[in-house]
């Protein structure tokens, strides 16, 4: 896997491009502050959050909003209070907002307010650049319209909400140049409405969303087939942008980019983070927007033109998803316990997934923004010229290339405060290329593939879009 490499301004100015490329393998490959975060997530905190969320009985989007002890309203109030408590502990560093919209639809037959609970930690250097982590607060049973029966939703998706609350706690006392957003969404099971609420809010506020890390079903390590795996996590990412125009698609068909959307390169970034800091957790990149025929709250972000990925456990147990609480009595399922209860959560595994998210957000928030205006030239030549626009906060840049069938970046060359480089004897036809920006203290951005297919700049959203089904 590609690793996150560190270099200093002194190295940039004192060492030639060629020498830097040769010495890349000897450059320190981690940051001490990130190394400390790797083991920081607390299983006790995660368990306490899920226990509390389960105690509200059901968190169905159409459940009670006025009770203090049951329903989605009580759950929202508790999450809001938890964020506010974390903010008090860091001297008011977090702002809590509750954007909402009213929807009707196939799974919302009457007008229903869908409210998100969002914690915002402003960046000190680049506050309009935003890194988002999401999970959904609502839960359901077998009948998606049943808002009365108990629906504990311990793994789907109290696990994701617990992870983002813990990430907010850990990062509340860390420095961040970009803004960090931690959002407990509602309305996911009824049609991804909470994701749309937050994506619309981001657009209205003019946020430059670098990514949404959507964590949904991240706490179970035992699959329905008996497979046990607490050492890997799936990261789903789209290959081409959801709102790609016909003109952009035509250009891509000639120049490539089918597997290099910003979301895909964000997945590669997360894999690199895990490889560097979490030797006991492997990122399994999945070349899909979501699981087959299913969806999640990352989809509204993609539809709005923002990069986004979905983080999900490696082996799901469908007896614990979207199920009434019951014990099987038929010949096929006698004795099987159905329902998404807390005993199905592996808290050590959830802590490792939480660490992956926390590290990714910390690294992204300290790195410069990804380069813009990346282009390549080299038709009818044996060398390739890579160009880009400089970004604020970058001390240097790194050019990457890989075989067109390779899943990860294979080669790299570090350059100083430049806006182009000529790769000698690297034929443009045979490789995919990208550029990342690097700060003076060694934090690196995701890699940007050339042109519209790989740009992290928000794509124009289509005039109208419809949400994918709930997962």
Language model feature labels by segment:
Residues 45-122:
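A non-catalytic alpha/beta surface segment that caps or lines the substrate-entry region
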Residues 54, 218-236, 285-366:
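Active-site-adjacent mobile loop/cap segments within catalytic or ligand-binding domains
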Residues 423-444:
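Beta-strand-rich modules
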Residues 23-70, 320, 330-334, 338-340:
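N-terminal capping segment at the start of a domain
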Residues 185-296, 304, 308:
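Metal-dependent peptidase/peptidase-like ectodomains
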Residues 382-394:
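Conserved aromatic anchor
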Residues 438-470:
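Extracellular fibronectin type III
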Residues 119, 133, 137-139, 143-192, ...:
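Alpha-helical metal-binding/catalytic segments enriched in His/Glu/Asp
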